């Protein structure tokens, strides 16, 4: 499907002051399931299925509007503590969503990137991620970033281990360590920090997501549960962002 967004939906959105990078914590799937149990069949044992159905319209809306990078918090390191059934269901949904979104990524020249400790994922899912990442790697103007088995603390630990190894091997010196150098060891080294972080579901926390990167990010929290999050809600977040004055900590 080509990149389209109805003009009437863009009312009061300035295309000159868009966030370059938007990140989303897609929260509320399980609460949605509890509220809509009569709609959930035995096969779809949680709201994750319905959360996955919300993805395409938000992805399309973001890139149609002109967002360059969209990062989605799909699966945290802590999510492995959930039931085996739920974890397996999530991995199955990831695999099917990658297949479904692949033609859209190709048609609209969007690159897939994945961040997190991917080595702990099922081999079949790792292979699917590698396949689509390779086939879209030349699409350099828009990035869809999936955070899978991702935790901000885990990312920093992995980064510092790599930095320490380079110190031991004398590839870098201790005097060269700076914010800029540390950034090069992060999963997100090749992308800008988020300008806007959207969290659905109403919880007022960042849940170990992009801890280094969101130091100066604008936060937008909505009570809308993720399966109910629609393009108009996404645009509400963009409008709210555009009414803020970013000071970068100053």
UniProtKB/Swiss-Prot annotation:
Entry keyword set: Magnesium, Metal-binding, Transferase
Signal peptide from the UniProt entry: none
Active site: 27, 79
Protein encoded by which gene: uppS
Pfam family, one: Prenyltransf
Organism superkingdom: Bacteria
Annotated positions binding substrate: 28-32, 48, 76-78, 80, 82, 199, 205-207
Cofactors: Mg(2+)
GO aspect biological process, one term: polyprenol biosynthetic process
EC number: 2.5.1.-
InterPro entries with a match to the protein in the record: UPP_synth-like, UPP_synth-like_CS, UPP_synth-like_sf
Name of the protein: Isoprenyl transferase
EC primary class: transferase
Cofactor note: Binds 2 magnesium ions per subunit.
PROSITE patterns, alphabetized: UPP_SYNTHASE (PS01066)
Purpose of the protein: Catalyzes the condensation of isopentenyl diphosphate (IPP) with allylic pyrophosphates generating different type of terpenoids.
Quaternary structure, from the entry: Homodimer.
NCBIfam families, sorted: PRK14840.1, uppS
Protein family: Belongs to the UPP synthase family.
GO molecular function: ditrans,polycis-polyprenyl diphosphate synthase [(2E,6E)-farnesyl diphosphate specific] activity; magnesium ion binding
Isomerase as UniProt keyword: no
Record-listed Mg(2+) binding positions: 27, 218
């Amino acid at each position: 499907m080509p990149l389209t967004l109805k003009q009437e939906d863009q009312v009061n959105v300035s295309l000159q002051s868009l966030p370059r990078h938007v990140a989303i914590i897609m929260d509320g799937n399980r609460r949605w399931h509890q509220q809509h149990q009569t709609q959930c069949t035995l096969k779809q044992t949680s709201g994750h299925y319905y959360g996955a159905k919300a993805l395409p319209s938000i992805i399309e809306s973001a890139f149609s509007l002109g967002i360059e990078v969209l990062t989605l918090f799909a699966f945290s390191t802590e999510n492995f503590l959930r039931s085996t059934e739920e974890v397996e269901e999530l991995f199955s949904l990831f695999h099917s969503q990658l297949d479904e979104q692949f033609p859209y990524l190709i048609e609209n020249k969007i690159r897939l990137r994945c961040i997190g400790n991917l080595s702990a994922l099922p081999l079949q899912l790792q292979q699917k991620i590698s396949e689509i990442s390779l086939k879209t790697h030349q699409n350099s103007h828009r990035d869809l970033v999936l955070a899978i088995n991702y935790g901000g603390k885990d990312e920093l630990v992995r980064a510092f281990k790599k930095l320490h190894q380079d110190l031991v091997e004398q590839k870098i010196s201790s005097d060269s360590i700076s914010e800029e150098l540390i950034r090069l060891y992060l999963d997100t080294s090749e992308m800008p920090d988020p300008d806007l972080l959207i969290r659905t579901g109403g919880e007022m926390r960042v849940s170990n997501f992009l801890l280094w990167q969101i130091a100066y990010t604008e936060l937008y929290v909505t009570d809308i549960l993720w399966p109910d999050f629609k393009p108009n809600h996404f645009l509400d977040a963009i409008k709210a962002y555009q009414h803020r004055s970013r000071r970068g900590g100053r």
